[in-house]
Amino acid sequence: MLASYASDPLKSRGRLYKEIPTSYRNEFERDRDRIIHTNAFRRLQYKTQVFINHEGDHYRNRLTHSLEVSTVARSVASTLNLSNDLAETIALAHDLGHTPFGHAGERALNECMREYNGFSHNAQSLKILTLLEKRYAAYNGVNLTWEVLEGIVKHNGPILGEINEYIAEYNKQNDLELSTYASAEAQIAALADDISYISHDLEDSIGAKIIDFNSLAELKYIDQHVVELKSKFKNISSSCLIYEVVRKLIHELITDLLWQTKENLNKEKITNIDEIRNLNYQIVDFTEKTNKNIKETKKFLHERVYKSNKITAISLKCTKIVQGLFKVYMDDINLLPVNWKMLIDSNETYSKARVIADYIAGMTDRFAIQEYNQLCSTSYITCF
C-alpha cells in the first residue's frame, strides 16, 4: 500500500491534454510505456555514457545507464512505500536530452549556443517530451502526467534564479511549481542516478584500464571491499572482483539512502506529498558520511577518469565534430533535413541556432560522425 505522502496515480494532477484513462495501466505506467516507445529513448543506445559506443560492446551507453538507474529507483521507492512506477518513469526519462558524445558533446553544444541562451540537457529532455517527439495527431510531444514532467525538470531540486528559456515558456501553460522540491519519487530518481553512475563508471574505467584496483586505495570506503574480497577469495579474477566490489557498493549506498530517508520522514512527521514539496531541504538523502564519500568519488572520477589522457583525447575529437556540425548548418540551412528546416522562423538567426541545436542534440554518436565525415571533414573519422 502506498504511503500517505506517495504520488498516487489515482490522484494525479493529470495531463495538459485530457485523455481517457486505461483500465489495465495506471497513469504512471502509461507514461513509462510512452517514454520507452519514443525515438529519443531508442537513440540512447548509441549515445555515450563515458566511453564511445564502438570502443567496446560491454561499456555502458545512455540507454543501459538509464535502465540501471530505473531499477535502483524502483527498488528504493518500493521499499519506502512510494510509487515505484513514477520513480522508474522519471529515471528512464532523465537522460533523454543528452547530446551525442556525453558531457563533451554537451559542453561543445553549450559553447556553440552561448550567444543564444546556451544548451541544457535537462531542459532538452522536457522539450523532447512536450514538443519534439511527433507521435500523436492531436498534439506535439507525448502528453505525460504533471508528476512525471515535474520530476524530470526538478529531480535535482527547485529551479531558482535564472530559468531556462524553454522551461519558463512551458511553465506558462503547465505550472510545474519550479520553486518547490519535486516528489520523493523524483528525488529518488536523482540519487539513483548518482548510485548508478559512480558505481558503473568505476567498473567501466577499470575494464578500460584507465584506473586499476590499486588506485581505489584513494577511496577507503571502496578499497575495504577490495581488500576483503582478495583475502576471502585468493584466486579471484579481476572481472569478478570489480563486479563484487560494485555489487557491495550499490548495496551499501542503497541501504544508507533508505535509512537516512526514513529518519528524515519520521523527523519531519510527513503526512502528505505537499509537505515534501514545501520543505526547505530534500527529504530523500544519504547520511552525511555517505554524502562525503560520494563527493570524494565524483572528484576521483573527474580527476582520474574524465580528465585522463584517453578520455581527453576522445573529448577533443567529439568537440570538433559537434562544433563543426553546428557551424556548417549555421552557414547553410539547406544541409538540414527538410522537416527540420521548416521549423526555422524566417531564417532568423536565433531561431536557426535553436533548431540546429535541437537537431544535433538528437543525434547518436555514429550519426554525428557520419554527418561530420560527409559535411565537414577532410580526414575521414571512423572511430576513436
Curated annotation (Swiss-Prot):
Q: Which UniProt keywords apply?
A: Hydrolase
According to the UniProt entry, its GO molecular function terms are: dGTPase activity
Q: Which SUPFAM superfamilies match?
A: HD-domain/PDEase-like
Q: Name the source's superkingdom.
A: Bacteria
- Is this entry keyworded Hydrolase? yes
Q: In which family does this protein belong, per the annotation?
A: Belongs to the dGTPase family. Type 2 subfamily.
User: What is the recorded name of this protein?
Assistant: Deoxyguanosinetriphosphate triphosphohydrolase-like protein
Taxonomic source organism: Rickettsia rickettsii (strain Sheila Smith)
